[in-house]
Amino acid sequence: EALKDADYAVTDDNATDIGIIVGTSEGALGTCCDFQSMITEKGNASGSAFKFPNTVYNAAGGYLSICSGIKGYNVTVTNGAQSGLASMAYAMSVLRSGQENAMLATGSDENSDTMTELFGKLGVTSENVVAPFAGNDGFVLSDGSASVLIEDEKAARERGARIYCHASGYGMAHSNVKFGTLTGSEAGLTNAVNNALADAGMTIDDIDAVFGFANGMKAV
């Protein structure tokens, strides 16, 4: 859908000029657990060679390449709930390096019985509608996927692409806090914002809107 919306046709001539970055937090964890349970209960011989490829994290990237015909850069990254954004940042780095003219950045995760059980035991899920800020009592698990086509600006304009936005910069940082801790992570967030501003050559006064990651997480 992203390629269709961008009116970008993958051909033999440009197949190596476009790459794929997939970001996923849990990947094929459900499939991995099912596969492990099968060989644990029935022995190694029960492991299917047809099912095993679906247990690796980069399975989605491989399938995207096969289905789309894209033959360039193909990498899978995992960075927790930020994996989708990380795929976009990685894609920007590849474009800046000049290795590709376009990158399909995708964020995708599936829910599974394993994830439902895990987060349920941790006590971080909610039985109600997600309340992102005030009254947050946990998040609700679900499937989700989104893709964007990020291009070199010159290449995009030359082909007459419909441009939604210009990605000026990105930043990453980390706070050494345990899962389920809602305080103490401010320094990491501040560093990430400052890094993004520096990368974009902007100041805080240049920012008109801020969109927060708010999944209703509660302290445990």
Protein language model features and the residues they cover:
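A glycine- and small-aliphatic-rich helix-loop capping segment at beta-alpha/alpha-beta transitions
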Residues: 33-44, 96, 117-128
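Active-site-proximal alpha-helical scaffold in enzymes
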Residues: 3-5, 57-106, 141-161
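Conserved beta-ketoacyl condensing-enzyme motif
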Residues: 1-63, 67-76, 111, 204-220
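Glycine-rich anion/phosphate-binding loop at the beta-strand->alpha-helix junction
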Residues: 101-102, 107-112, 118, 124
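Solvent-exposed alpha-helices and their adjacent loops that cap or buttress functional pockets
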Residues: 11-15, 45, 57, 68-70, ...
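Stable alpha-helical structural segments in soluble proteins, enriched in small hydrophobic residues
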Residues: 1-9, 87, 192-200
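Short, well-ordered, mixed-charge alpha-helical segments that flank or form enzyme active sites
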Residues: 28-31, 83-87, 111-115, 176-177
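Condensing-enzyme catalytic core mediating Claisen C-C bond formation in acyl metabolism
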Residues: 123-202, 208-209
